[in-house]
């Protein structure tokens, strides 16, 4: 079934699958129904992977949702549903997310509103890097995400400060490698893919994330 994937992607996906298969098994028992029949969304959906407090789970590469902008969360759920995100065979965490995002518009609206009610606290710092070097590299990022990394809705750029740093490292690495942002319908992802050219290696990625960590989260 996974023979279309490169060997290293298959290995990574299987490792990830052993952690999330129990979650997927539970979710198979929970139908996504129409608006008249839906039940309130609770830990059966998002919190099983993203945490009961919405702060994320590094072990299964599930980022924090608490504090995420409603418009950005909506866009990502819609992208997963449309196959715009999580389509690349090397984006193993994205592939794992796609079955979880087969939602109606009303379901997405419910989830976005529910997540928006969670308390927000900045994520713990787990990534080390050269903050001074990262500050220089972040100049390109600031064009869209702002000098304070608090995001810019008009640019479609989410806040970076306060997000799980391991998640930022993973996603920047995916953009650099071409695993994310290459779908022809991913307008904002394509913009990101074009902007990460200055991040030439893992050290540069960690440096810029270390600088983001040094900024005050909202």
Per-region residue spans from a language model:
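An amphipathic alpha-helix signature
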Residues: 70, 74-82, 105-112, 116, ...
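N-terminal secretory signal peptides that target proteins for export/translocation
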Residues: 1-15
């Amino acid at each position: 079934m996974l023979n279309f994937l490169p060997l290293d992607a298959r290995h990574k996906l299987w490792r990830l699958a052993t952690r999330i298969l129990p979650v997927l098994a539970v979710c198979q028992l929970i139908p996504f129904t129409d608006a008249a029949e839906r039940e309130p969304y609770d830990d059966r959906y998002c919190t099983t992977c993203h945490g009961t407090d919405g702060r994320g789970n590094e072990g299964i590469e599930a980022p924090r949702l608490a504090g995420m902008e409603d418009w950005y969360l909506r866009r990502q759920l819609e992208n997963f549903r449309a196959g715009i995100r999580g389509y690349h065979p090397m984006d193993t965490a994205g592939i794992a997310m796609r079955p979880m995002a087969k939602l109606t518009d009303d379901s997405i609206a419910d989830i976005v509103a529910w997540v928006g009610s969670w308390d927000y606290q900045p994520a713990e710092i787990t990534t080390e890097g050269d903050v001074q070097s990262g500050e220089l590299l972040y100049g390109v990022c600031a064009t869209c995400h702002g000098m304070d990394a608090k995001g810019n809705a008009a640019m479609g750029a989410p806040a970076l400060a306060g997000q799980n740093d391991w998640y930022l490292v993973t996603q920047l690495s995916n953009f650099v490698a071409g695993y994310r942002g290459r779908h022809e319908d991913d307008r904002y992802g394509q913009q990101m893919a074009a902007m990460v050219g200055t991040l030439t290696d893992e050290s540069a990625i960690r440096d810029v994330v270390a600088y983001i960590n040094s900024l005050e989260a909202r």
